[in-house]
Design a protein with these regions (language model features):
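Positively charged n-region of N-terminal signal peptides that target proteins for export
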Residues: 1-5
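Repetitive helical segments and hydrophobic/amphipathic motifs
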Residues: 12-13
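Solvent-exposed loop/turn segments connecting transmembrane beta-strands
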Residues: 22-36, 74-75, 92, 152-163
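Outer-membrane beta-barrel pore domains and translocons
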Residues: 30-32, 52-54, 101-105, 144-150, ...
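Gram-negative (and chloroplast) outer-membrane scaffold detector with strong preference
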Residues: 39-143
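A generic structural motif
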Residues: 7, 32, 42-44
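Sec/Tat signal peptide C-region and signal peptidase I cleavage site
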Residues: 6, 16-22
Length: 176
């Protein structure tokens, strides 16, 4: 009967949760918001890639009239952010991770006194955080901090800006 088939499929799906899951897909929110995918390459190493839109207040350094000027501004960015991570399982489903990666995408400089300027964005970042993997459900929750450096390039104005690029984020992912 249909009930037996559904029950059997449900039992198989739940039993799959008892084996090691190497893939996680979900959402990341905070300093940027979007989709997150994590692939365990071995017991302790993973690649995590986020495709996200972010908004942040940052400091920007630029060269004006032969002197270095530091200013603060708002950035709206759309990036892909792959990271290589070392994962260490602690106890009771809690794990810690650290690593680094890069970000590539577009950034929109938003300033009250000027029109928005679009930049190509290229950066490097560190990543440190902790997570919790549920024992009975195929879900993980994580918090992380990603300090970094970004170059913002604008061809029209022949400008290169340097920015402190940071994100604090929370994520939830489905494991499979």
């Amino acid at each position: 009967s249909m009930k037996k088939i559904i029950f059997s499929l449900l039992c198989v799906a739940i039993s799959m949760g008892t084996f090691a899951q190497n893939n996680e897909v979900g959402l990341v929110v905070g300093g940027f918001n979007g989709l997150s995918y994590k692939k365990m390459m071995s017991e302790n190493f993973a690649i995590q890639t986020d495709l996200a839109v972010g908004f942040q207040r940052t400091s920007i350094d630029w060269l004006g009239d032969s002197e270095l000027i530091t200013t603060t501004g708002d950035l709206l960015d759309f990036v892909i952010n792959p990271n290589f991570l070392y994962n260490k399982e602690l106890k009771y489903g809690i794990y810690a991770f650290a690593g680094g990666g890069a970000s590539v995408g577009l950034a929109q400089g938003l300033h009250a006194s000027a029109s928005p300027i679009t930049f190509g964005k290229f950066g490097l970042n560190g990543m440190i955080g902790a997570g919790y993997k549920l024992a009975d459900l195929p879900l993980t929750f994580a918090l992380d901090f990603r300090p970094g450096y970004a170059m913002l390039l604008n061809v029209k104005y022949e400008a290169i800006f340097h920015a402190f690029d940071w994100h604090l984020a929370a994520s939830v992912r489905y494991c499979f």
